[in-house]
Amino acid sequence: MNQFTKPIIIATLILLLPPVAVLMVGWQWQPMGEYLWLEILYWITNTSGKPWCYLVFLFFILGLLLLFATSARQGVILVAIVMMLLLTGQGIKVLVKNTTKEPRPYVVWLEKSYRVPTGEFYQHQRKQRAEVLQRYLKADDRIPQWQLTHWKRETGYAFPSGHTLFAASLSLLLVGFLWPRRRYILSIIVTVWAMGVLISRMALGMHWPQDIITSTLISAVLVMVICYLTEKWRVIDDKKDLAV
């Protein structure tokens, strides 16, 4: 077993705890109103969506370069590895979303509460979908304005979760790189961040637990492959001092 395999598996299982628990108890999303903790989750979810995901991506890249790159060539390879990981995950997301066409939880709730058929909702263009949400929900006290704004920006299909693919891929990659090199605190921090993103996607009515589970597993497989290749190609310089 490679040195990165065990920590990635453990981190994956930790990330799967919330969606598996939600799936087992049969929890169904319902509007929760205006709560500070829910708005905090909204800001956490923004770290893995446009435009803030670009800043997070740059932060992760900078961290990798500072920790592991001992030459310009090594830095370029590290950046290419992360780009390949994220682009592959997002490519899978686009392909599967357009194939399965699973409605988001909030769209299913909209159908039950306002009799807007999910099929009819998704027949509209994205701009028209946002207009439908505005028309029906602008006066609904159960939906905070920030949540409505978030929904209007994300009116696509649910399965799989692009936010989860982004957060889980980055966090698992860093765990695979950091944990074997005794960077335990950083490994825990990125895992907690990713878990926050996963929980936020369910709490905000954006994804079903099975979306989160599948996306996390896809990320884990991709990260395993990437870590195997980096070890095979000796991309990471183990002689660099990483002790904390």
Residue locations for each model-derived region?
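Hydrophobic alpha-helical bundle signature of multipass membrane enzymes
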Residues: N2-T155, A168-L178, I188-V190
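Membrane-embedded catalytic cores of phosphoryl/pyrophosphoryl-handling enzymes
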Residues: N2-F4, I9, R129-V244
